A protein has these predicted regions:
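Short, membrane-exposed interhelical loops at transmembrane-helix boundaries
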Residues: 182-183
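12-transmembrane solute porter fold
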Residues: 8-178
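C-terminal membrane-cytosol helix-exit motif in multi-pass small-molecule transporters
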Residues: 1-5
Length: 183
């Protein structure tokens, strides 16, 4: 309530009245909730279920951030010429396909399927992230871009935190107090 009435709020809640700003921030937090735990789940599968060492797991897992780092700059430039929301939507569709590939993940899931999933997620997230941030930043007046940037960071941290919390609760419910060890 104090922030709403402040002349110079630390975090301007009023920005969320802007539908484009709100929807793009919701998309951001949902994307982090959906994708942040993938590394933990796949790494646990590799090391504790399949018995891979951490180096091999890391080499496979680098697929996602590597492809994201390659695609994101191009997607950012493209989003200056084409509707960024369309690019971001295509990116999230690709991420969703990648996540669906991991639904049946177990000890017998082909590494090719896991790599395809990570590749799709990296490409999709690369297509999503920069255009979505472009949408958020361009949806506010120039004087509010510092606040919009804070919102982007807040959604990222909140999404990652919620993602980890949800995974922890799921692990606790499904496994109880069992010690996780390589098989």
């Amino acid at each position: 309530k104090i922030e709403l009435n402040s002349k110079y709020p630390a975090y301007d809640i009023k920005l969320y009245k802007n539908k484009k700003f709100l929807s793009s921030n919701i998309a951001s937090i949902l994307s982090y909730i959906a994708t942040f735990v993938v590394t933990t789940i796949v790494n646990s599968n590799f090391q504790y279920v399949r018995g891979f060492d951490s180096q091999l797991s890391g080499l496979i897992l680098i697929t996602f951030p590597l492809l994201m780092a390659i695609v994101a700059p191009a997607a950012g430039k493209l989003s200056d010429r084409i509707d960024p929301q369309k690019i971001a939507t295509i990116g999230m569709i690709i991420v969703t396909v990648g996540l669906i590939l991991l639904v049946p993940l177990d000890k017998d899931t082909s590494i090719v399927i896991v790599l395809a999933s990570l590749a799709l997620q990296g490409i999709g997230y690369g297509l999503f992230a920069s255009p979505n941030i472009n949408t958020i930043m361009s949806s506010v007046p120039p004087k509010d871009t510092p606040m919009a940037s804070s919102a982007v960071a807040t959604m990222r941290i909140l999404g990652q935190t919620l993602s980890t919390g949800i995974l922890t609760v799921i692990f606790a419910i499904m496994m109880g107090n069992v010690i996780i060890q390589p098989s």
